[in-house]
């Protein structure tokens, strides 16, 4: 019987602001769950990807550096199963994600994609957006300034100036939604789905979850949330995912405000890891292949 060799790619700490230990924990638990299922797991860094030092029958990982994403895409193009897909990770950049979720008619805040060199106030007025969230459009969040709550159009103008001065050319603007903030985690093709109130557990990166205040327990349709999240994951091509939504305090509807490739699963990592391992093993069965670059010998 063939023993599958699975390469695990750790996330570079730059892409784990305030969550380095949590990201490392879910990576470790997933690797152990795969080993318990009979796989040989080789652990690599994102730098190993750039050096073409990865050899395996399949890859799982949390890479987010643009160079790493391109490496994963090349592996996929060569027939290697990769979870999450490099193409799916790229779609989780703010701009492509906003376009895709909007085009798929998924419940989502009114959003604009604007050049930071422009004055955003006319576009905000036209869209009837006042308080909003301003997010850099080019890739994943790596610092507190990459996502900013702007309480007014004038504040948004100031945020645009700062982003432009920092060399960020495009911003995504999401209208601010009032209501309960709910965070969720899921694994496609499995029964795993977990949702919770982050303010109740003090779970967050930069304290931005405090803008909406403590959860009030506004009633919402949990099955509808799960269905919406699975739909969004399918649109983006993600298999291991998480994100945030707002349960409206006016109509009780759930709207997605963020969607991520392979989050930390911090409050539920022990329960999630076996399902993630099953997802990875299932991908091997769906897309048999192997990848061994010439001279590859690095094994962590």
Give the ranges of each region predicted by the language model:
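Protein kinase-like catalytic core scaffold
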Residues: 132, 172, 192, 253-258
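Active-site nucleotide/adenylate-binding loops and adjacent lid/helix of ATP-dependent enzymes
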Residues: 6-9, 79, 87-174, 178-179, ...
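A short beta-strand motif that forms the metal-chelation/ATP-contact edge
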Residues: 56-60, 184-186, 251-267
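Anionic group-transfer/hydrolysis microenvironments
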Residues: 137, 176-177, 185, 244-246, ...
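Phosphate-binding site of ATP-dependent enzymes
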Residues: 148-236
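Conserved N-proximal alpha/beta basic substrate-recognition cap immediately N-terminal to
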Residues: 8-113
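A long amphipathic alpha-helix within ATP-dependent nucleotide-binding catalytic cores
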Residues: 204-256, 277-292
